[in-house]
Swiss-Prot record:
Protein name listed in UniProt: Uroporphyrinogen decarboxylase
EC code(s) of this entry: 4.1.1.37
The protein's assembly and partners: Homodimer.
Residues binding substrate: 23-27, 72, 149, 204, 318
Record-marked site positions (Transition state stabilizer): 72
Gene3D superfamilies: 3.20.20.210
Pfam family, one: URO-D
Enzyme class: lyase
Functional note: Catalyzes the decarboxylation of four acetate groups of uroporphyrinogen-III to yield coproporphyrinogen-III.
Superkingdom to which the source organism belongs: Bacteria
Assigned keywords, A-Z: Cytoplasm, Decarboxylase, Lyase, Porphyrin biosynthesis
Amino acid sequence: MGDRLLRAARGEVLDRPPVWMMRQAGRYMAAYRELQSKYTFKQRCEIPELAVEISLQPFRAFAPDGVILFSDILTPLEGMGIPFELVEHQGPIIDPPIRSQAQIERIRLLEPEESLPFIKTILSTLRREVEGKATLLGFVGSPWTLACYAVEGRSSKDYAHIKSLAFAQPPLLHQLLSKLADSIARYVIYQIEGGAQVVQLFDTWAGQLSPVDYECWALPYQKQIVDQVKARYPQVPLILYINGSAALLERVGKAGIDVFSLDWMSDMAEARARLGSLAVQGNLDPMVLLGSPEFIRQRTLEVIRKAGSRGHIMNLGHGIHPSTPEANVHYFFETVRQSAELIHLR
């Protein structure tokens, strides 16, 4: 059933949930590490043959119900006039960081056909490869999280620079976030037109905001993207992921998304009640996959049982840890595929 993930994202009741993993193409796989040793991260993201191969590695190994584009949330920034460097094992570096009116005014509206032609090539190739066997996912970064990188200049522990901008010069940050939202909306549409059937928005760092600041700095710009995309493609499900979302669950649906991707720090049953009619994705602690097969099965089935059969996509609550044994990943996928029978037998 190649459309299982698509059907779950639309809120349907299924015999068992579809399953994929955030960062399912990555360093935990020996096949990926072989390519990592030969090519830079930028090459792996932007050379279509490499990105397609990397995206398909976990599909061949584990047969997930979803295949996701191998890329990076910062990929569109260069097309907007925000250069960055991806440093292996350090993450992205934006130097100089974006902190002034003049810098924000120089940011261009993204023209993905011009600056990101490889993305459409990758997606269209993947769609042909997985058609009828899995759902193809695209993904983007959401404005608050992209702004965190742009303003801080790199990963941050306290987000001092962007919060200083928010609280001392709010019009400046609103201008930046709105520009980012318009460009990312274009990027989502471009991915859909390239073949993506579902698109996930990563607003990973929105969990660092208080509820009142989430409603000011993250939610409006998530909605700005969703509104523009839904005006063109109302039938395409959109997933939103926020790390550390426990304080925000009653608010995330206001963005107009179809599915909320839950981190592992919330109880699935309690989150379901708080999310209302939204479909849900998640939310196994990635570190569970470092445990014994029996423990992996127990915790996986517990999440599935609590989520229920309507509108649930099984996933981790964050990206898979690089040290995870591939055998444990295989066991996780097999457990989900057998979950209807296993839960019935318990």
